[in-house]
Amino acid sequence: MARIDAFLKLGTQQGCSDVHLAVGVPPMLRMHGDLMPIKFRELRGVELEGYITEILTHAQNQLFAKGGDLDFSYVSTEGGRFRVNVYRKDTGVGATFRAIPAEVPTLEKLALPPIVAKLCDFHQGMVLVTGSTGTGKSTTLAAMIDHLNQTRRLNIISLEDPIEFVHPSKNSQVIQRELGTHIPSFAEGVRAAMREDPDVILVGELRDAETISMAMTAAETGHLVLGTLHTTSAVKTIDRVIDALPVEEREQTKSFLAQSLLAVVTQVLVKTADGHGRKAICEVLMMTKAIAKLIQTEQTHQIPTQLQMGRDLGMQLLDQALLAAITAHSVDPDDAYTYALEKRAFQKYVTDTSMLPKVDLTGSTTVPTSNSAA
């Protein structure tokens, strides 16, 4: 048993999302969004480096010895699966272990908007799931792949860095390929996947112009493409795609988005009202003729109005979704406020702006009784 497994076992037992190990501080657990130290001494440099090198392959050890960062998946002796990032910093080495649930969560369990399941019914086009690091994008995509795997007969090719959730083939065939192990880059992975008779291609991250371009080609040629971007709203997602590609391809990119982008789902993880978990709250854009025209005429700043008016199509602004979750007493109002994009407008619904304990969409006044959701 690797020595590092003891910390991972403790983290799993505590239900944490991440285990952080760094020189000069005790091991820390990410619990419901907060970083909590465990009762242990500060880790020493030589000690932690020994813990880490025990779980590396020969090739990974060579790269790490040269000062390179590492991203890989790891299965502990207890059977726990983790996504790992190993790095060096000013005081020495460090590592972050993201816990991956043993079972792929369903869309229903994640309580995502019903429109997310309907996106899995499309046969071609692009769906983007976006958000900052650690907002559950990979989990949402895994749930979508699982839904496709159970409800349709498809050839699904998933390109990941690293492989997180493992998908046994059910009604569909699921082929999972890992960056650095099976493919040299996401762009090359998409290029290869298109020669493998795919129905669905998942691209773990649209991180550069070449990958975006290849993913666009796949979506235009009759495949359903799922991908992620580190953007925090639907508008920023569209602008990022347009700006990522060469200026001379700008018109072509806008045309692609107008014709082949199906939806953008942007999510954040907000503390639940009881403080014992986090809930995904989503902004949803569904492509319409009106939004397509705004993209083509470079008036993306007007898209939020379309989201606000498009609730019958499954669309919603992030702030709308946050307010609805607060009204339903499912999330902590204080934490929800920190994710609001238009905080000044958001505050109009808050009865106590100094404490932000209660939000009421009806506009009626309510005397707050505590600093938490009722």
Question: What are these model-derived regions, one by one?
Answer:
Residues 1-374:
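Short, flexible helix-loop junctions that flank or precede catalytic/ligand sites
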